[in-house]
Amino acid sequence: MIVEKKYVAAASGVLLSALVANYSLSDEAPAAWEAPTRAAAKKNPVAADTDSVAAGKKVYASNCLACHGEKGKGDGPASAAVNPKPHDLAEEAVKKQSDGALFWKLTEGRKPMPAYDKTLSESERWQVINYVRTLGK
C-alpha cells in the first residue's frame, strides 16, 4: 500500500511537471487579453504631467524594464527567458487601449507578467501608465 502511494505521488509529480513544461514552452499565441468594460472605462486620476511621467519612468525602470525593455519594445534583458514574449508597449494596439484597461492589466497581471496590485500603489500604477503613453513618441 505504501509502495502504491509512492508510485501515485511520483506519477502525479511527473504529470504536473509535463503540464507546466507544456504551458511554458508553448509557441501558441495567447488569447486576446481584454479588460472588462467597467475596468476599461475607469479614468486615470493622476494628471500626465512632467512629475507624474518622471515618477512613472522610475517605477517602470524598477518593475517593467527587465522584460519590456528601455523603450517598451518587449526586448528587455529578461525577455528571452519569457514565454509568451512581452508585448511592445509602444505599438498602436496598446496606444488604442484606455488608461483604465492598462491599469486593470497592470493590476491583475497575466502569466508570465505578475499582478502589481500588492507591489505598487494605485498612484504608482497610474504613473507607469502615464509614462508608457510617452513610449514611441
Description of each model-found segment:
Residues 29-59:
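Electrostatic cytochrome c docking/interface patches
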Residues 73-74, 122:
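Short, non-ligating residues that shape and space the ligands of small metal-coordination modules
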Residues 24-27:
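Boundary of Sec targeting at the N-terminus
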Residues 32-35, 77-82:
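Short, flexible, mixed-charge acidic loops at enzyme active sites
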Residues 11-19:
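Bacterial N-terminal signal peptides
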Residues 81-135:
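Extracytoplasmic electron-transfer domains, predominantly the class I c-type cytochrome c fold
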Residues 2-11:
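Bacterial N-terminal signal peptides that target proteins for export
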Residues 49-73, 79, 102-108:
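Sequence/structural segment immediately N-terminal to covalent heme-attachment motifs in c-type
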